[in-house]
Amino acid sequence: MEKGERKNVYKVYNKIGHWFAENRYADSVEQAYLNDILQRLSTEAKVLDLGCGDGKPILEYFINHGINVVGVDASEQMIELAKINFPSTRFLLKDMREFDLDEKFDLIIAWHSFFHLPADDQPNMFTVFKRHLKPNGILLFTSGTERGEVWGMNGGENLFHASLATTEYQTLLQANKFEVLSHKINDPDCGGANVWMAQYKP
């Protein structure tokens, strides 16, 4: 199987954005995590979704609950779809590795997006996370369970995924002053996702 884009996976989403929006699971397997986080947020909270795609279903969940959200994605096609879906919401065309909004948020989500970054790029993201989080803010992200790379077909394109080892994520979180609130491996109630929830404690 021919391998594709490794460094900038968002370029693949520029090709398959419409397919992805139509075929992404719509059964809200993330619901339990979103419900948990919603209970931790005030009505004045601000949410940043890194790799927001077309905004469904995660940003849509918070929008429907009256929470102020900002979506970031490096794929032009995904941002275009997001703006169509939620015209009153702020969306930014930016690479999550290379931006600074000069804003603080109560929650940062990198759900099924962080793991599209090469392993060498992932450690620096924890600086981005803490730069954009308020004290006691929540970080929610998904990862693999061991260091390595995986390729998977989506919309006729071979999509790159990468992960560090679980111990490496634990070390990075601790070094950047995050307290792990929960870590579920291959959560059967969430499509087999490996889900981290941590709180920034500067």
Question: Where are the regions that the model predicts?
Answer:
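Conserved class I S-adenosyl-L-methionine
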Residues: 1-42
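Class I SAM-dependent methyltransferase SAM/SAH-binding core
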Residues: 48, 54-98
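A conserved beta-strand element that flanks and buttresses the S-adenosyl-L-methionine
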Residues: 109-110
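A short glycine-rich, Lys/Arg-flanked "PGG" loop and its adjoining helix->strand segment in the class I
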Residues: 123-135
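Conserved beta-strand signature within the Rossmann-like core of class I S-adenosyl-L-methionine
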Residues: 136-143
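Short "lid" loop at the C-terminus of a central beta-strand within the Rossmann-like core
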Residues: 144-149
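Acceptor-substrate binding/catalytic loop of class I
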Residues: 151-168
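Core SAM-dependent methyltransferase catalytic element
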Residues: 185-202
